Regions:
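Core catalytic region of metal-dependent phosphoesterases/phosphodiesterases
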Residues: 1-79
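Catalytic-core regions built around general acid/base machinery
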Residues: 28-40, 165, 169-181
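Short, flexible, glycine/charge-rich loop motifs used to bind or transfer phosphoryl groups or to couple energy/partner
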Residues: 33-34, 59-60, 73-74, 119, ...
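Proline-rich low-complexity regions
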Residues: 42, 141-142, 184
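A broad structural signal for short, well-ordered beta-strand segments within beta-sheet-rich domains
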Residues: 67-68, 107, 183
Length: 184
């Protein structure tokens, strides 16, 4: 446990939910439950691009008291902070993952609804409810955060003609979320 106790641990995506059966994740939970209880830990996970969104925004959500997945735009309250959680990102390796699914159709490996979503209505509702967000946890980031260049992306774009524009749109989505939060 690295000396961590009495803590909320937020995992900012890429947990791997969807690559294995639901029983696999339940077994992990049962394996770590004793430690979560003994050290008073709660693990909350938001979706990354290497996660099936159904585990976060759909019918496969994990809702254990000390181990759970959260939907986009969930507000966590901890240590006097209001923490906004927004998952999703574009997979730069999606063509390779799609090719693997052709060879192994019984295995999930890519989800088309992976991108982050700018939900202005959800953000407006926070303002209407007088919820002041002081912490934001996301899987990807606005354009002013690292990585600020797309160096290294060009080799992936050789195999995915839409990747450059999709990652540009991803950053714009995150910029829009950031601007909205600053405005409120």
């Amino acid at each position: 446990t690295y000396g961590i106790h009495d803590a909320l641990i937020i995992v900012a995506g890429d947990c791997g939910f969807g690559f294995e059966s639901p029983d696999y994740y339940e077994d992990i939970y049962l394996t770590i439950l004793r430690h979560l209880q003994a050290y008073n830990l709660c693990i909350v996970m938001l979706r990354g691009n290497h996660d099936n969104p159904a585990y976060f925004n759909g019918d496969k959500r994990i809702t254990h008291e000390r181990w759970q997945t959260v939907a986009d735009y969930t507000i966590l309250q901890a240590c006097s902070h209001n923490i906004l959680c927004i998952g999703g990102a574009i997979s730069i390796d999606r063509t390779r993952r799609l090719q693997r699914m052709v060879l192994h159709p019984e295995q999930e490996g890519y989800w088309t609804d992976e991108a982050p979503i700018y939900d202005s209505e959800a953000l407006d509702a926070l303002k209407e409810q007088c919820v002041l967000i002081d912490t934001v946890v996301t899987h990807t980031a606005p354009s002013f955060c690292e990585l600020q260049t797309k160096r290294g992306l060009t080799s992936w774009c050789m195999h995915d003609s839409a990747l450059w524009s999709d990652t540009t749109q991803e950053r714009q989505t995150m910029d829009d979320i950031h601007a909205h939060l600053l405005r409120d």
